[in-house]
């Protein structure tokens, strides 16, 4: 039988293909219709999410499916999708997209792995230093935290640049090679 069913997040595809805007929501539903099958996020596109919302939604899905959702992240190459959400796609501004993606991934892994955390970067100030119930908020906690720690994370390997490979190693992210990436020489550079 099958072990894992993988699907990709895509938006605004009026042509009628790749029309799954929320993998986590779909996988929670499918997990309740199956007994053992795992579901792979191939991939949640970071620049179309706030990293804390993605972390919360994955953690909830992890609990509701009893650990049957495999987390995956991507940078976003469809300009129609990513740019519509107000962020740079790899097709329009690759450098800005990578910078945003890397910071979002840092926030995700802090949220998953630290009991409480803060992050002050170029794009995110988490939490904002605001008064809260009589004190200044300095850190937050992801609630719920993922059921399964450490979170297994996958990412597409497209360019196989040294920077991309080093980034994946830093966070223990596993790579998937397929589609156009495999025909573009990535397979030879990685293997």
Mark where each language-model region is.
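Active-site-adjacent structural elements that line small-molecule/cofactor binding pockets in enzymes
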Residues: 2-191
